[in-house]
Amino acid sequence: MQTDSTQAAHELGDASFYLHDYHFRQDNHNGICTLQPQSRQGYGNVYQVQPADGLFLSTGNWIPYASMERKYEINQKLVKIYYLESGSVTLIQNGRKAQTITEGIHLYLNKPSQGRVLYQPNIPISYASVLLFEDYIEKNLQDRFTPDDFDYAEVYDWKAFDYNTPEVGTLFLQIRDKLIAGETSRLYYESKVGELLSIVAGNFHKQRQQIASKQQNLSKSEEKVLESVRQAIEQNVLNPPEVSQLCKIAAMGQTKLRESFKSIY
């Protein structure tokens, strides 16, 4: 069973769940896989493209009519970066405490592992996703670029403020719109994946340098309130709270908040 689910995920990407677990209707046209729930299950569409072996980009906008559960057990390493625009989604992984997936950009690392994803009924699920299996990463990224450009090992150290940014959110919206429009260019999608990883890796290196050099200038209490500000921003990076609200969270004036926040983030 484990081998079957792993193979299905590698061959079909996220579509394996929709096809095998819930038997969504499928239509393949010019390299774009379109999936639709059965009429009794929900309403909407999921689009997926596979530019290369081990690489999948997808977007979905659909409404489940009843609670849905996705069980997975994947015996391969993979990296998934996705932007959840809306939806009530819960992740339960390897017996850990249930985690509610908030709106924004998220990183999922399979090392390998198993778990469940729960979807609540009658709440629109809107997302865009990039899924990379380890064989794609090694062949197309790790073997072609130096660690200064992309270091696979560093992915496991990425933090939310490296990838949950407006720039990354905008990139996912571009991918979403191209998929819906029927774009099939392998060059386009692989270049977008490269751009995505380059942005996040660049943010990671920048943040690491800044934290090392400037964190010593802030007190522990200031670091704590700035972390609260960062979390408030990450709740919706494309429409963050007003500066006045952030000042209240930090109990700082605008100038001090701006300078202190920039010093570590």
What are these regions (language model features)?
Residues C33-F150:
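N-terminal regulatory/effector-sensing and dimerization cores
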Residues D151-N164, L179-Y188, L197-Q231, Q235:
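Short, Lys/Arg-enriched, Trp-marked, Pro/Gly-tolerant hinge/linker segments that flank
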Residues N140, F145-P147, A153, F161-F172:
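A short mid-domain helix/strand-loop element embedded in enzyme catalytic domains
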Residues A52, A181, L238-N239:
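Helix-turn-helix/winged-helix DNA-binding modules
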Residues L196-H205, S228, A232-Y265:
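Basic/polar phosphate-binding segments, predominantly the helix-turn-helix DNA-binding elements
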Residues M1-H29:
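Short Lys/Arg-enriched alpha/beta "domain-start" segment
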